[in-house]
């Protein structure tokens, strides 16, 4: 439901990290979660060994998220074991039934299902996932890209919509519009990739700092730590 207020607590996930030194630096700024894209054709792709290297150096309070698309259970198990991530973000065409299988197979993994919003029909699918996943992530639709487009979807589609589980907003969020995005849509968290980059996979730490400053988040005051099952 739309209103003009900012929630008292908001999670911030920075996604599309590829450089260990940047991931460690951003984790120390007070973000809630870091996302690592494992889809090979993505310009933000990062290998499992690099993800594992990063995860070993992060505090457990920072949720580590592997972003995947249409992997089978065996591949997911190998990824979780190899990297040590705390969460899986299913960003492909995974069905509610498949998400249930993932939940049963990985009961201790935080499970996020991304939906790429093309129309109100996309949002109608949310209830089918809500009882299985820990978070829904609503992202902008693009016919060739799974995310990181830098474009928002039509936020007015969320007007008066009841989402029956915690959810995060993605797509076209920047340090400049983050407060507007949160006030207008009222998510529990926001997810940024291109909005804080100098180029795909390389973050602009100054823009990350500006984002967190605009939201009143710092290294000693992470408003919504996500690094445990919720």
Swiss-Prot record:
Example of a GO biological process term: L-tryptophan biosynthetic process
Pfam families in the cross-refs: PRAI
Entries under Gene3D superfamilies matching the protein: Aldolase class I
Transmembrane segments: none
Name of protein: N-(5'-phosphoribosyl)anthranilate isomerase
Reactions that this protein is recorded to catalyse: N-(5-phospho-beta-D-ribosyl)anthranilate = 1-(2-carboxyphenylamino)-1-deoxy-D-ribulose 5-phosphate
Top EC category: isomerase
Entry keywords, A to Z: Amino-acid biosynthesis, Aromatic amino acid biosynthesis, Isomerase, Tryptophan biosynthesis
PANTHER family, per the entry: N-(5'-PHOSPHORIBOSYL)ANTHRANILATE ISOMERASE
Family: Belongs to the TrpF family.
HAMAP family given in the database record: PRAI
InterPro entries recorded: Aldolase_TIM, PRAI_dom, RibuloseP-bd_barrel, TrpF_fam
GO molecular function, a single term: phosphoribosylanthranilate isomerase activity
Disulfide links within the chain: none
Record EC number: 5.3.1.24
Pathway(s) this gene product operates in, as recorded in its UniProt entry: Amino-acid biosynthesis; L-tryptophan biosynthesis; L-tryptophan from chorismate: step 3/5
Superkingdom of the organism of origin: Bacteria
């Amino acid at each position: 439901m739309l209103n003009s207020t900012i929630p008292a607590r908001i999670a911030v996930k920075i996604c599309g990290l590829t450089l260990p030194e940047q991931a460690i630096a951003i984790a120390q700024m007070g973000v809630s979660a870091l996302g690592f894209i494992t889809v090979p054709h993505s310009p933000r792709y990062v290998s499992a060994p690099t993800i594992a290297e990063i995860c070993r150096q992060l505090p457990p309070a920072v949720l580590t998220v592997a972003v995947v698309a249409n992997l089978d259970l065996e591949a997911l198990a190998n990824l979780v074991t190899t990297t040590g991530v705390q969460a899986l973000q299913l960003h492909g065409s995974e069905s509610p039934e498949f998400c249930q299988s993932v939940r049963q197979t990985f009961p201790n993994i935080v499970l996020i299902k991304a939906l790429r919003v093309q129309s109100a029909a996309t949002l109608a699918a949310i209830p089918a996932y809500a009882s299985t996943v820990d978070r829904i992530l609503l992202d902008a639709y693009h016919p060739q890209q799974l995310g990181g487009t830098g474009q928002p979807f039509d936020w007015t589609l969320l007007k008066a919509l009841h989402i029956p589980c915690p959810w995060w907003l993605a797509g076209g969020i920047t340090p400049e519009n983050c407060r507007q995005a949160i006030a207008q849509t009222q998510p529990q968290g926001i997810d940024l990739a291109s909005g804080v980059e100098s180029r795909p996979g390389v973050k602009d730490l100054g823009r990350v700092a500006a984002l967190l400053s605009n939201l009143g988040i710092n290294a000693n005051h992470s408003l919504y730590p996500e690094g445990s099952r919720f």
